[in-house]
Structure formats: structure tokens, C-alpha cells
């Protein structure tokens, strides 16, 4: 089989595009970590990077919702990178590890998580509503345990209720209190699929 020559200019352009896109997602993460969501727009991104407004608009199809969705997924991948190396063959332990990692990240990044949570409210019922890698991984672990759809929904509900508690009460700083609430319920569900 004969290979067609690769146009190196296209490869360089693709790498440059990906590099700029990653930079914009990092800037978005920093903005969501330090500013209120209502103070952020595609225009404000240009204040924190050397990327032109035109390029920013091109990367996100002139849509602030697309920007928020991609930043949320980007943050989800960061959280996923934290726990991935510690996953085992035990889906029960993995589920609790993912929850714990998520909560610890929430506790240490309150402003970011508040803005992400507010973004979810903005994006609900739109094409931009993001499904994070964290939720995909939790769902996979629960499927490996042969959970019913009803039990999977209950675990995810508990997950979101706990996120509400964290975001609603920034004085709650002890992850162990949250995990004490979720572990018994999780184990009950995990042992009774």
C-alpha cells in the first residue's frame, strides 16, 4: 500500500491550532477559577492571552456556551488524570476513588466549581450541555458492577446533592465528612446491584 505524502504545512497548522486551543482552555480554567461567571465573556479571554479575539471566536464558533462546555470537559479531564493512575480492578473501590477525587478537587477549587455548576444551569437543554469524563468513568464502574439504571441514577443523584452541599457551604472543608455520608450509601448500592 502506497502512502500519500503528508503536507507538513497542514500538520504544523493542526499542531498550532491544538496548542492555541489548549492555551485558551487553560485561560478559561483560570478565569473560571478567579472571576464570577457573569464577568467572563469571549472578549475577556483576550485580556489574559496574546491570542486575538478573532481567533478566540473561531475556536469556539463565536459561542460562549461552546467555550463553557469545552472548559468544563477540560477540567473534567484534569480531574480524571488525578485518579486514573490509582484505578484498580475493583469497580467498588474505583467508584469511591472517583468520588473522593472529585470532592477534593471541589474543595480546593470552590470558585471554579461554582462557576462550572452555574454553567451547567446555563447549558441545560442546549446542545452544549457537557458530559464530563468523570461521570463517564463513574457510569462505567457502575455498569461493571451490573447496577440497574435506577441504582445508577441514585448514585449520580447523591453525587450531585453532595456537590450542592459543597458549593452552598464553603465553610465545609473536611472531605471525610462528605465521604462518610456517601460511602455507606454507595456500599449499600454497590453490594446490592
Question: Residue ranges of each PLM-predicted region?
Answer:
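Amphipathic alpha-helical linker/stalk segments
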Residues: 71-98
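Helical hydrophobic small-molecule/effector-binding pocket
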Residues: 92-118, 125-130
